[in-house]
């Protein structure tokens, strides 16, 4: 039987649709390059979105003179604690930036993140000043004391730090969302009732939106690692969960009083962490629950595909790999649209590359 040569127009159409990357198993270097490239593109998308939708200032965006000055000691303790945590922004920013300095996207984003956290520090400083339960002199002395301490990174590699930050950013967002409810007068907890304050509502809402944006950025990074390095990423996530703690708490002289106020106000505690932080983060990562992630990975091995190429076959107890893949593809599509809008697709486009990994189980 003679096989007819396909029409040239059909051949041309197929070639035009061929992805600009080789098929087959990706090397570690290729995976790292793809991840880095996507992070860079995501960072650039993020900065545009940030300036368009969250362009506020801690001095001029709030009517600080209208802030109540008769809040309860318990609520004042919470505000003072938030102020204290933000005094370590120079450490949060500089140490992570230094560790990520070889990654353009990660280091550039960390600088942007630090600029946004700087606004949070100024916001809580203004809040503490206008609450008037502490004198400016006391606040100045307390700030000096706090800044004599130094926070250290909880992990010294990008993979672990990514998953740590996913959980931490969601926890921080939840703190501010629950503070917003208190400031709306919706709390029935002793020491937090009758706390309605429109200025504090706006402050908590504004900063919670920033934390949501931070959470979503690091969530996208975590999905990239889960997609291209599922076994290693899950192992890192398990380790982070086992050792997780909120940053800089141990550096506060009133750590126990602050933690107790958060707990009594139902702002943040073990229940909120398990139900509203960890479970929510795991769900967004394609993992149904804590028990599933604790079971970890059964085995990871390489097997030949039908063409004889060796591919990773990762058997995972509870990772919805297809959902992760869909989310990663959606991310690449988002940054592609951004690059199209500004013209980068004509010069240096970012492409999605399939991982080539098969998930069984």
Task: Map each language-model feature to its residues.
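Non-heme di-metal
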Residues: 2-361
């Amino acid at each position: 039987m003679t096989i007819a040569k396909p029409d040239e127009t059909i051949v041309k159409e197929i070639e035009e649709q061929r992805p600009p990357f080789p098929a087959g198993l990706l090397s570690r270097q290729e995976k790292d390059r793809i991840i880095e490239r996507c992070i860079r593109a995501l960072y650039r998308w993020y900065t545009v979105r940030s300036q368009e939708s969250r362009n506020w200032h801690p001095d001029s965006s709030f009517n600080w003179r209208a802030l109540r000055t008769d809040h309860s000691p318990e609520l004042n303790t919470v505000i003072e604690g938030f102020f204290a945590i933000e005094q370590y922004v120079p450490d949060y920013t500089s140490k992570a930036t230094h560790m990520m300095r070889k990654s353009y996207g990660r280091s550039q984003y960390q600088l942007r993140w630090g600029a946004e956290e700087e606004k949070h520090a100024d916001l809580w400083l203004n809040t503490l000043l206008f609450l008037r339960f502490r004198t400016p002199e006391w606040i100045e002395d307390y700030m000096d004391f706090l800044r004599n301490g130094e926070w250290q990174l909880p992990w010294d590699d990008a993979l672990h730090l990514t998953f740590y930050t996913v959980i931490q950013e969601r926890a921080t967002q939840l703190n501010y969302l629950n503070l917003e409810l208190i400031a709306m007068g919706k709390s029935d907890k002793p020491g937090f009732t009758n706390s309605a304050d429109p200025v504090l509502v706006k402050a908590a809402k504004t900063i919670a939106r920033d934390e949501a944006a931070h959470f979503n950025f690091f969530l996208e990074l975590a999905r990239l690692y889960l997609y291209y390095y599922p076994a290693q990423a899950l192992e890192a996530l398990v380790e982070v969960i086992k050792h997780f703690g909120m940053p800089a708490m141990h550096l506060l002289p009133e750590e126990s009083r602050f933690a107790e106020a958060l707990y009594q106000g139902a702002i943040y505690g073990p229940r909120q962490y398990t139900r509203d932080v960890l479970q929510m983060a795991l769900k967004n990562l394609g993992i149904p629950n804590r028990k599933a992630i604790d079971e970890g990975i059964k085995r990871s091995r390489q097997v030949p595909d039908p063409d004889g190429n060796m591919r990773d076959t990762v058997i995972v107890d509870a990772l919805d790999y297809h959902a992760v893949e869909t989310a990663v593809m959606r991310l690449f599509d988002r940054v592609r649209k951004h690059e199209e809008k500004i013209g980068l697709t004509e010069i240096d486009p970012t492409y999605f590359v399939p991982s080539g990994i098969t998930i069984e189980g």
